[in-house]
Amino acid sequence: MSFSRSAADPADTLPDLAATLAAPDTHAFLRLGDAFHTRLPAAPLAAPYVVGFSDEVARLLGLPASLAAQPGFAELFAGNPTRDWPAEALPYASVYSGHQFGVWAGQLGDGRALTIGELPGTDGRRYELQLKGSGRTPYSRMGDGRAVLRSSIREFLCSEAMHHLGIPTTRALTVIGSDQPVVREEIETAAVVTRVSESFVRFGHFEHFFSNNRPDLLRALADHVIDRFYPACRDADDPYLALLEAATRRTAELVAQWQAVGFCHGVMNTDNMSILGVTIDYGPFGFVDAFDANHICNHSDTGGRYAYRMQPRIAHWNCYCLAQALLPLIGLQHGIADDDARAERAVDDAQAVLATFPERFGPALERAMRAKLGLALERDGDAALANQLLETMHASRADFTLTFRRLAQLSKHDASRDAPVRDLFIDREAFDAWANLYRARLSEETRDDAARAAAMNRVNPKYVLRNHLAELAIRRAKEKDFSEVERLAQVLRRPFDEQPEHESYAALPPDWAGSLEVSCSS
C-alpha cells in the first residue's frame, strides 16, 4: 500500500489517506492467503468524536498533526467508511489460537479488531493500522466486538507512555468515542482505539496452525515473519530454530524491562504475546504503586498467575508454547529422513534455546537494576543489593516509582539527605541497614553524587501511568472533557523530566486509589 504525502496541501491528507486505505490491499500479511484472515467491514459507530490523538504517531506515519481536526477523521477511524469499500479492500480480522490462564482455549482470533491497512513510516519501516473495538468478527465468540471508553483511553495512554519509557510496544494513533451504549458490568459507551505496529502476529498465530495440523501454513507464517522482521534468521543453519531463539531473546528482554519499571501486564496469555517482542494488548494492566512482589493488577486473575513476580516465569512458559508450535519446522534443513529422529532432534534443539531464557532475562534485569541504582561499575554483589532493596520495599510497601526516583537524592557521604526516600518506608531501620550497604557500594564508584543522580534520573521515571491518573482522565472524558487525556498524555511523554507544573502527577496515590479495580470486563 502506498501513500502520497503532499506537504503542499495538508488539507488533502485525510481524503488521500481514506482513498489509500479503501484501495485494494496487497500488503504482506494478506498475501499469506484466506486461511489467515477474514475480510469484513467495521460495524457502524454512531456519531463518533475524537477523544485523544497522538501527533507523534501521526508524524511517524508521515501524517500531519492537523489530521485529527480535519472533517471525517472520527468517521474514518471509527471504521464507518469501510462499509462502502470494495470487497478486495475491506479490513480484515486474523485468526489465531492460544493458551489462556494456562489452559488451551482453542481457536480465538481478532474478536473485536480489524486491520484497515499498512502505511510506510518515516523511519523506513511499515506499520499496520488496527481498529480495536470495531465490532463483531467471525472470531468474536460470545462477545459484542466492542471496546469501551475507559479501556480504550487506558490503552491509548499506556501505549504511548511505554514508548516514552523506552519499552518496546505497539503505538496508538487515536481514540474515537461515541455515545453508543454497550453492556458490561454496567452500561458504558463504545470507543475505538487505533493501534499501530509493524505486525500484530502473536504466539497464538503459530499455535493455531500447529494445533490444526497445517505445517504448510505454519511454514508460510514463519517464512513471512522471518523475511519481514528477522531476516538474519534466514542465513542461520536452521532458520526456524533461529526464529525461536530471536523471539525468546526479545521476550526475555522485554519482560526484564517490565520488571524494572514495575509494570504488570495482567493477561499474559499466549495470544497476547507478540512475535516481535513488543508489549501488546493493554487490558487490566497496572504500574505497581506500594510495592508488593505478589501484586496482581487484574481483578479477574484470582489465582495470581500473572502477578508481578510471576511475569518472567510465565513469559518463559509462553516461549515453550511457541517452541511446541514451531517443532514441525525445526530441523527441516538438516535433511534427516527418519521423522522420529528429526522430531527428537527438534525437541533437543528447542529445549536448548528455551534454556537460554534465564540467561537472557537475568543479565538484562541486572543491567537495568544496576542503572536504576546508579552503578556504573559492575560488581558481583549488585544483584543481591538490588534484591535486598526490593525485599525491603516489599516489607514496607514502599512506592516503587518514588523509591527509585528519590534514591538519586541519597548521598554517598551524608546520611542526613536520606529523608525523602527513607520516609517512604514503614521500617526505617530496615531501610537504614540497606542504605549503609548501598553507600558502601557507592564508595567504589568514581562518579560524584551529582553525576550519579543525573544518570539515575535518566532511567528512573518520575511519571508513570498510575491507575488513579488514568481514572481521573476517564471520568472527565465521560463528561466530554478530554483535556485531562491530552494533559496526561503530554506529561507521560517526558517521564524522566522534572515538570514542576505537573508535580501532582508524581505524588503518592490518594487513599481512594486503593479501591480501583481493573479486570478483563472491557
Curated annotation (Swiss-Prot):
Gene coding for it: ydiU
Key words of the record: ATP-binding, Magnesium, Manganese, Metal-binding, Nucleotide-binding, Nucleotidyltransferase, Transferase
Chain residues that bind ATP: G109, G111, R112, K132, D144, G145, R195, R202, D281
E.C. code: 2.7.7.-, 2.7.7.108
Function statement: Nucleotidyltransferase involved in the post-translational modification of proteins. It can catalyze the addition of adenosine monophosphate (AMP) or uridine monophosphate (UMP) to a protein, resulting in modifications known as AMPylation and UMPylation.
Catalytic machinery residues: D271
InterPro entries referenced in this protein's UniProt entry, alphabetically: SelO
Protein name per the record: Protein nucleotidyltransferase YdiU
Xref: Pfam families: SelO
Catalytic activity of the protein: L-seryl-[protein] + ATP = 3-O-(5'-adenylyl)-L-seryl-[protein] + diphosphate; L-threonyl-[protein] + ATP = 3-O-(5'-adenylyl)-L-threonyl-[protein] + diphosphate; L-tyrosyl-[protein] + ATP = O-(5'-adenylyl)-L-tyrosyl-[protein] + diphosphate; L-histidyl-[protein] + UTP = N(tele)-(5'-uridylyl)-L-histidyl-[protein] + diphosphate
Family as reported in the entry's similarity comment: Belongs to the SELO family.
Superkingdom of origin organism: Bacteria
Stored HAMAP family: YdiU_SelO
PANTHER family given in the database record: PROTEIN ADENYLYLTRANSFERASE SELO, MITOCHONDRIAL
GO molecular function terms listed in the Swiss-Prot or TrEMBL record: AMPylase activity; ATP binding; magnesium ion binding
Binding-site list for Mg(2+): N272, D281
Cofactors, names only: Mg(2+); Mn(2+)
